[in-house]
Amino acid sequence: MVSIPEYYEGKNILLTGATGFLGKVLLEKLLRSCPRVNSVYVLVRQKAGQTPQERVEEILSSKLFDRLRDENPDFREKIIAINSELTQPKLALSEEDKEIIIDSTNVIFHCAATVRFNENLRDAVQLNVIATRQLILLAQQMKNLEVFMHVSTAYAYCNRKHIDEVVYPPPVDPKKLIDSLEWMDDGLVNDITPKLIGDRPNTYIYTKALAEYVVQQEGAKLNVAIVRPSIVGASWKEPFPGWIDNFNGPSGLFIAAGKGILRTMRASNNALADLVPVDVVVNTSLAAAWYSGVNRPRNIMVYNCTTGSTNPFHWGEVEYHVISTFKRNPLEQAFRRPNVNLTSNHLLYHYWIAVSHKAPAFLYDIYLRMTGRSPRMMKTITRLHKAMVFLEYFTSNSWVWNTDNVNMLMNQLNPEDKKTFNIDVRQLHWAEYIENYCMGTKKYVLNEEMSGLPAARKHLNKLRNIRYGFNTILVILIWRIFIARSQMARNIWYFVVSLCYKFLSYFRASSTMRY
């Protein structure tokens, strides 16, 4: 059987979602590890006055591509940016570009999707379902297409506790939903959304399940594979450890925890934190397309790209390692010292929200007003709480994913491909990964230099001293209030003070005796 780089040699690849986190890493890995690929057509829309070519050039200039620039300086020649709008009819392709794609494409990687959990249903259906269907229809016209690779999510069927590597029946017929959305106004769509999505937590999950069914039905005559990653996190190894460039998912929470803003979160300490590194998802996608292209299986291949069943990690452990990392290597200008309390108790959660989030933010905004600055902390806390609401479903529940196809795929790789396209998450050391992840948010998301660590540590020590001083004053005030009114409290106070004095006297005497 040919190796993965040999399979992609001379191939023309069509990639959607190249401006997204996963798409960027896939593009880099494909060009670096399969250097003899012929060309990569990247579907990109114009945005903010930038042409598709300018947007692609901006991506290629990022640190993510530093290693590729060193190993293959001419890689840009293989990338062809094509103006396309996935939400428009026929993907808004020009006739010339369409003809080139139809004649040349060998493998499609469909990574584009709206990942906003609070997206309204109409927009989520447009990008996640209708755009996928239009891409399938385009793929059916391609003369040399070998594989259609669709990236979904492991949570598409989160209404089930055990999820196999199959496409389940959809909650509603996608065609009927699309037809209905054409005549419904936005108000009606918003009203019926909760009933439609049912026991799924958001429109993203709901529409990704519909998209899988569309791929299965509309792409029945194509050679299709589906990869379902769980919570995609920073890179494990490639192109270097800890690469992350966004606030999505756990990244934003890690940063908020490191800044001392996030103090409590509704989560179960024992719930599985099914994080999967982005490079594992990319390697799985490239390997899955290779397997389908070489073996042409009779049925659609689905791969649950998860970690919980083979290398379990829990949210309580995530919290411990994140806080430990940011205490050793703090973020600059932290609001408070990092400390997070996870709880699944409703009343306790709201108590900590009031005491640890809203009260300090309110007092800090008063301080900002008094010093002539614009208050901002309550707005930050409000945004944080909205993000927490969307994520608490995933931090409070656990699922079991079957990974037989992933295990089969891993066994099909030759020894060299197992190293180059590593998908064996049993080798993943979680403590090291979380530390690299946290440092990645510091370096690549917040753009903080490691040379600033001494100052950041000094600032954290200052916050610690302020906290100890505040707590000491608070205890003294409380005791003084009780002492003034209660003889018993006064006796206890004098007893504690005398005990401390005796202890200090004994310690001083014993120290003197040693000399």
Swiss-Prot record:
Family membership: Belongs to the fatty acyl-CoA reductase family.
Short name of one Pfam family: Sterile
Location(s) in or outside the cell: Peroxisome membrane
Region of interest (Necessary and sufficient for PEX19-mediated localization into peroxisome membrane), ranges: 451-507
Catalytic activity: a long-chain fatty acyl-CoA + 2 NADPH + 2 H(+) = a long-chain primary fatty alcohol + 2 NADP(+) + CoA; hexadecanoyl-CoA + 2 NADPH + 2 H(+) = hexadecan-1-ol + 2 NADP(+) + CoA; octadecanoyl-CoA + 2 NADPH + 2 H(+) = octadecan-1-ol + 2 NADP(+) + CoA; (9Z)-octadecenoyl-CoA + 2 NADPH + 2 H(+) = (9Z)-octadecen-1-ol + 2 NADP(+) + CoA
Protein name per UniProt: Fatty acyl-CoA reductase 1
Assembly behavior: Interacts with PEX19; PEX19 mediates the targeting of FAR1 to peroxisomes.
Entry membrane topology: Single-pass membrane protein
Cytoplasmic side: 1-465
Chain's role: Catalyzes the reduction of saturated and unsaturated C16 or C18 fatty acyl-CoA to fatty alcohols. It plays an essential role in the production of ether lipids/plasmalogens which synthesis requires fatty alcohols. In parallel, it is also required for wax monoesters production since fatty alcohols also constitute a substrate for their synthesis.
Molecular function per GO: alcohol-forming long-chain fatty acyl-CoA reductase activity; alcohol-forming very long-chain fatty acyl-CoA reductase activity
Tissue specificity: Widely expressed. Expressed in all tissues examined. Highest expression seen in preputial gland. Expressed in the brain where large quantities of ether lipids are synthesized.
Gene Ontology biological process: ether lipid biosynthetic process; glycerophospholipid biosynthetic process; long-chain fatty-acyl-CoA metabolic process; wax biosynthetic process
Ranges facing Peroxisomal side: 484-515
pH dependence: Optimum pH is 7.4.
Matches recorded under InterPro entries: FAR (IPR026055), FAR_C (IPR033640), Far_NAD-bd (IPR013120), NAD(P)-bd_dom_sf (IPR036291)
Record's GO cellular component terms: peroxisomal membrane; peroxisome
Keywords noted in UniProt: Lipid biosynthesis, Lipid metabolism, Membrane, NADP, Oxidoreductase, Peroxisome, Transmembrane, Transmembrane helix
CDD domains named among the record's database cross-references: FAR-N_SDR_e, FAR_C
Transmembrane segments: 466-483
Main EC class the enzyme belongs to: oxidoreductase
Top-level taxon in the UniProt lineage: Eukaryota
